[in-house]
Each structure stands twice: as C-alpha cells, then as structure tokens.
C-alpha cells in the first residue's frame, strides 16, 4: 500500500490559462495541490478559478512575466496562506530566460 503525503502542497503556474499550463493546473487540482495561477487574460483565470476552485484553494495573479516589476509586485501581493510555494511550473510562452541565472 502506498501512503500519500497528507500535507497540502502549493504550486505556482505561469502561463496557466491555456495549453500545457492549463492541463498542469487541472492535473494538480485533481491531485489536491493548491494553485497560484498566473496569466495575462483575467477572464481565463476567472474561468479556471470557477472550474478548479471546487477541488482546491486557488489564487489568481493577472500579470505579464516579461515585466520584472510586475512579477515582483504580483508575488509580493500573495496572501499569507499562499506564500510557501512547493512547486514552480515556469510555463509562460514569452519567458525566454535570456539573462544569466544570477540576474534573471
């Protein structure tokens, strides 16, 4: 018998409103992982929140990952119960990551 860890995990997913990001969010919700869903389209974030919020706790962040200032502001705005992030899915389509790791 496999025993699953009972502590709730939290995942932050960029580019969560479509494609791989949306599929990952759905899978994680089905695995009882709380979600921080990030995207540029608020209406899509709202749809996901309505669909997956029945399964797990969800917090949405509407911003563009290409702006470091917007990223910092969004992460700083997280409620206390979402500040500990266990899993990061850096999926946003335009997050090229061209800067060196120490400055990115």
Feature locations, PLM:
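Rossmann-fold scaffold of SDR-type NAD(P)-dependent oxidoreductases
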Residues: 14, 85-93
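Conserved glycine-rich cofactor-binding loop
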Residues: 17-18
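N-terminal Rossmann-fold NAD(P) dinucleotide-binding loop
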Residues: 21-22
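Aromatic pocket-lining residues of Rossmann-like dinucleotide-binding sites
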Residues: 28
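Conserved glycine-rich Rossmann-like NAD(P)H-binding loop of the short-chain dehydrogenase/reductase
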Residues: 33-47
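A conserved hydrophobic alpha-helix of the Rossmann-fold in NAD(P)-dependent oxidoreductases
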Residues: 45, 71-78
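The beta1-alpha1 cofactor-binding region of Rossmann-like NAD(H)/NADP(H)-dependent oxidoreductases
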Residues: 63-73
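Conserved mid-core segment of classical short-chain dehydrogenase/reductases
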Residues: 72, 95-104
């Amino acid at each position: 018998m496999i025993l699953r860890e009972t502590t709730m995990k939290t995942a932050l997913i960029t580019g969560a409103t479509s494609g791989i990001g949306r599929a990952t969010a759905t899978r994680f919700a089905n695995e009882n992982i709380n979600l921080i869903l990030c995207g540029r389209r608020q209406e899509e974030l709202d749809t996901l929140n309505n669909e997956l919020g029945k399964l797990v706790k969800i917090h949405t962040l509407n911003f563009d990952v290409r702006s470091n200032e917007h990223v910092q502001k969004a992460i700083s705005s997280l409620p206390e119960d979402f500040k500990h992030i266990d899993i990061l899915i850096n999926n946003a389509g335009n997050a090229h990551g061209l800067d060196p790791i120490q400055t990115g």
